[in-house]
């Protein structure tokens, strides 16, 4: 687990140097996946391109972007995810905390009945914003490579600090 909390007090980009730790790991993974022109800037912006497959060179480029930081307001270490299999559609207690996710407050939960849910235990953040986005983007690239999926030009970027530094 690579911790990447942003620092609201910082006046630099990135607001926390630990975001470079994740960026360096992602850079290597992007290169291993065959992403071209992978670049990590001195302000921790990471980006690369995937050329179009034959016959799709004139298709419009599509960009995928996610940020590497997590919020700093909550505990972001010793994360204890809770996995609820076959969710019953009722209120969902977050671990031993007093926090509850209720379908009344979050109506979308009703559509997830029978699914597997991953939440925090209520004492820490889960860190899925936006590391889940990063995982989805890289998994998409891996799958496109493995399954030889045709596509137009693709651009991928991972940024530091979702919220701008003042």
Predicted segment positions?
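Short, intrinsically disordered, charge-balanced linker/junction segments flanking boundaries
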Residues: 1-2, 162-166
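N-terminal capping segment at the start of a domain
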Residues: 1-16, 119
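A non-catalytic alpha/beta surface segment that caps or lines the substrate-entry region
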Residues: 11-59, 63-65, 69
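Short beta->alpha junction loops
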Residues: 15, 160-161
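Self-splicing inteins and homing endonuclease
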Residues: 46-54, 114, 153-155, 162
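Active-site metal-coordination/substrate-binding segment of hydrolases
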Residues: 56-151, 158
């Amino acid at each position: 687990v690579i911790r990447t909390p942003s620092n609201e007090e910082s006046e630099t980009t990135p607001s926390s140097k630990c975001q470079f730790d994740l960026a360096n790991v992602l850079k290597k993974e992007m290169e291993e996946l065959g992403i071209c022109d992978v670049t990590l800037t001195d302000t921790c912006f990471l980006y690369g391109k995937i050329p179009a497959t034959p016959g799709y060179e004139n298709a419009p480029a599509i960009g995928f972007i996610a940020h590497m930081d997590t919020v700093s307001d909550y505990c972001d270490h010793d994360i204890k995810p809770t996995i609820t299999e076959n969710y019953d559609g009722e209120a969902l207690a977050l671990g031993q905390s007093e926090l509850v996710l209720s379908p009344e407050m979050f109506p979308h939960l009703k559509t997830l009945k029978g699914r597997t849910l991953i939440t925090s235990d209520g004492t820490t953040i889960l860190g899925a914003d936006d590391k889940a986005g990063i995982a989805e983007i890289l998994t998409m690239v891996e799958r496109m490579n493995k399954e030889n999926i045709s596509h137009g030009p693709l651009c991928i970027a991972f940024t530091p600090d979702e919220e701008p530094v003042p």
